[in-house]
């Protein structure tokens, strides 16, 4: 790097394979990674070149090696995704020159990574044509970007002594809390049922605003009542059974309206701020109201289907 014209952009893949002759240790060790990173950063500052360091990550997505390297650089970005899905999420864990709540969505193609201009359309592209019980569309926000994704639930009678709880793409502890609230404040007896919850598309949801959508999918599966296909759900459920307002309500409603949804089941007064959105808001104050709303439509939507019936306490 020191010979010839100074480059404008330098990519090191990966920092764990670099070594310095002045450090008596093998490549990949803590001292070598730290020393190599320091030397490269000094070169970048002296030459004015932009430096991109590619590093290994652990199984839980954390940067492998010494944390001091993370403190030395200006920004830390990581890709999320798996081999079963074509999309990748680019998140910022650190950014000295901007916000860390932004997220980029890319699709892996034969020509490399392509930007996805409409991520919500990507995650909802494979929805079934007919309305089926146990599926609810969650109006979420990833960073500062609104994102609509389908949450799927299956509630089936258990064949073993202990009911099974399985969840993919959501926090298991969050599912356990929602189930407990549905039993305590919604009158739903779930102790004799296996519960499976899945976030379609392989996306992982972290925000508590998904509570209401997950609860709606669970109630829908248990009662056999299909949820309206033109509706979205969002809201945080408290231990008292109340549904609390969440941030970026206007952003969620605007994204839902853009994709053709006409109804939103959300806490009271979801349009706290922002420009008016052409979407009908259905206030949901507590889980008991949600259970009553879905159960009331069970007779119509369950016609011709056989499914488990709720046991009300």
Language model features by range: what are they?
Residues 1-9, 15-313:
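Peripheral, non-AAA+ core regions of ATP-driven protein-machinery
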């Amino acid at each position: 790097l020191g010979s010839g014209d100074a480059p404008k952009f330098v990519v090191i893949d990966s920092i764990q394979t670099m070594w310095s002759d002045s450090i008596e240790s093998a490549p990949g060790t803590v001292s070598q990674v730290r020393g190599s990173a320091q030397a490269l950063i000094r070169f970048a500052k002296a030459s004015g070149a932009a430096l991109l360091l590619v590093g290994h990550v652990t199984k839980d997505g954390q940067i492998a090696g010494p944390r001091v390297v993370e403190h030395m650089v200006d920004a830390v970005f990581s890709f999320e995704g798996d081999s079963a899905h074509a999309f990748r999420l680019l998140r910022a864990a650190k950014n000295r020159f901007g916000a860390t709540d932004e997220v980029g969505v890319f699709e892996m193609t034969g020509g490399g990574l392509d930007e996805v201009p409409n991520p919500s359309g990507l995650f909802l592209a494979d929805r079934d044509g007919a309305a089926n019980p146990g599926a609810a569309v969650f109006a979420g926000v990833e960073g500062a970007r609104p994102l609509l994704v389908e949450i799927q639930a299956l509630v089936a009678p258990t064949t073993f002594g202990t009911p099974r709880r399985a969840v993919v793409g959501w926090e298991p502890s969050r599912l356990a809390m929602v189930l407990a609230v549905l039993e305590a404040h919604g009158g739903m007896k779930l102790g004799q049922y296996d519960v499976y919850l899945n976030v379609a598309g392989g996306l992982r949801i972290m925000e508590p605003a998904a509570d209401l959508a997950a609860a709606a999918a669970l109630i829908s599966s248990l009662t056999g009542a299909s949820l309206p296909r033109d509706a979205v759900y969002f809201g945080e459920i408290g231990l008292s059974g109340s549904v609390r307002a969440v941030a970026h309500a206007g952003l969620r409603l605007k994204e839902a309206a853009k994709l053709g949804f006409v109804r939103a089941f959300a806490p009271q007064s979801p349009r706290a701020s922002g420009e008016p959105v052409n979407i009908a808001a259905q206030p949901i104050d507590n889980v008991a109201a949600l259970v009553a709303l879905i159960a009331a439509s069970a007779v119509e939507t369950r016609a011709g289907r056989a499914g488990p019936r709720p046991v009300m306490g």
